[in-house]
Structure formats: structure tokens, C-alpha cells
Regions:
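Blade/loop signatures of beta-propeller domains
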Residues: 1-5
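Gly/serine-rich nucleotide phosphate-binding loop at the start of the catalytic core
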Residues: 7-10, 32
Length: 124
């Protein structure tokens, strides 16, 4: 049976089956990841001109991810550490999705290639 490409279905499997059952991550990790997607999904829906329920995995591409990270820093005034934590949550999902929907590996790989941001060195 082929796993659906819709983002909401994959996220549901990611949170319920993968994070909780298979990985057995802490409830704090689940909450942090959940909070990331509560911010990211409305942003992605607006950017894609779609409703959240109609988003596809392919909508989560590198260009949209870069715009989201910029939004976190510039409009939400998040620190680099927070930006990187949000990116880590999205990467965890993308790694899961790459196994569940290998047909979308080219899009997923490009999104996974978005780097973390390094903190600026403070000069005395």
C-alpha cells in the first residue's frame, strides 16, 4: 500500500506512530515539534495559496523552508538557536517522510540540505 503524499496524513503518522511509538521520544520533544508545525503549517499554506488540509509533501520544499526560517528570524524575532531547533524538528519529519514516501526523495533531499545557521562570533 502506497503512503499518501498529503502532508496532514504524514504528520499524523509521524507524531502518533513514529515519535511516540517507535522512537519513544519525551513528551517535551513531541510538544516542541508540535509547536514548530503549528507555526510552520499556516505559513506554508499561505505561501502555497492552499488550505492546510490540502498541503502536499512537495509543498515543503527548500525554497519554502528557507522563507520560513527567514520569517522566524526577521518577523518573529526568534534567536538563531530557536530557528535551528525549528529546523531540526522539520528535518526529523523529512527524514521520516523520506522512508515513507521514497518517490518524493528529490524534493525531500533538497529541503534536508538547508543548513543550520551558525551563531555570529562575538568580538571583544
Amino acid at each position: 500500500m502506497k503512503v499518501q503524499n498529503d502532508l496532514s496524513h504524514l504528520l499524523q503518522l509521524f507524531f502518533k506512530s513514529y515519535l511516540v511509538s517507535q522512537r519513544q521520544v519525551s513528551q517535551h520533544t513531541v510538544a516542541a515539534y508540535r509547536d514548530t508545525f503549528r507555526i510552520f503549517l499556516p505559513f506554508l499554506a499561505k505561501l502555497s495559496n492552499k488550505k492546510i488540509g490540502t498541503l502536499l509533501l512537495t509543498d515543503l520544499n527548500a525554497a519554502h523552508l528557507i522563507k520560513f526560517l527567514s520569517y522566524l528570524e526577521n518577523e518573529r524575532a526568534n534567536s538563531i538557536a530557536t530557528r535551528n531547533a525549528r529546523l531540526a524538528a522539520i528535518r526529523a519529519f523529512l527524514n521520516y517522510a523520506s522512508i515513507e514516501v521514497p518517490d518524493e526523495l528529490p524534493v525531500i533531499s533538497r529541503a534536508l540540505a538547508v543548513p543550520q545557521k551558525k551563531k555570529a562570533l562575538q568580538r571583544n
